[in-house]
């Protein structure tokens, strides 16, 4: 006869809600970061600063287009799943949101093409120089982090080291086999995206730590940052393993065997 518990008591519902929150808020921060580089590239009075910002924009644009839309669909499907059967019917509108998000992976140029642009033109095309702008900035942030930020700066340092090693591996492999570029591009873009979001969340955590106790807003940011580092950033390890698996397994079947 008692009322049922609200579904937020279920760990899996909390997992989905926190995944939505962490990816959406991380994506907003990353979008703002890219927008800041656009402004810097256009308005900075220093030529060196403008050039660096232009190269960062070139590097990060395919990540913004593809990773945000891939994660956007994931979070929208989580929202549908939380509704249960009601998420599938028209009454609540969630099924339409899924359709609306699905097209975003296609109409800016399919996300596979965005990934090819990132790896082929921006990373390999620049000899890794464009990506070093970004990874060096993250490493400078890590070096400046105090002990209180260590729970975020240490895994961020490991993530950016992994990204640099993966980039070097791909630069080397692509010299002998151009198929490696296409085989690795989507997973590489996702490794890049998760690492970029980790940087955004570390920046937000630094602000939240300085203001904790002032407002629930900052407590929420800090808790979400901890969730991101604990549950989402580790995805880079399986993705990196897929990149390093190479292109061979993609060519084991003839076209007629598909």
Positions of PLM-derived features:
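Alpha-helix capping/hinge segments and adjacent helical runs
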Residues: 33, 55-133, 223, 227-253
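C-terminal helix-coil-helix/basic helical segment that borders enzyme active sites and/or dimer interfaces
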Residues: 25-64, 168-183, 204-219
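Short glycine/serine- and small hydrophobic-enriched flexible loop segments
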Residues: 36, 77, 120-121, 200-206
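Terminal amphipathic helices with adjacent charged low-complexity linkers/tails
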Residues: 1-16, 22
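Short, charge-rich amphipathic alpha-helices with coiled-coil/heptad character
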Residues: 135-141
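C-terminal amphipathic alpha-helical interaction region
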Residues: 125, 141-258
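Secondary-structure transition/capping motifs at alpha-helix termini
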Residues: 23-29, 37-51, 74, 78-90, ...
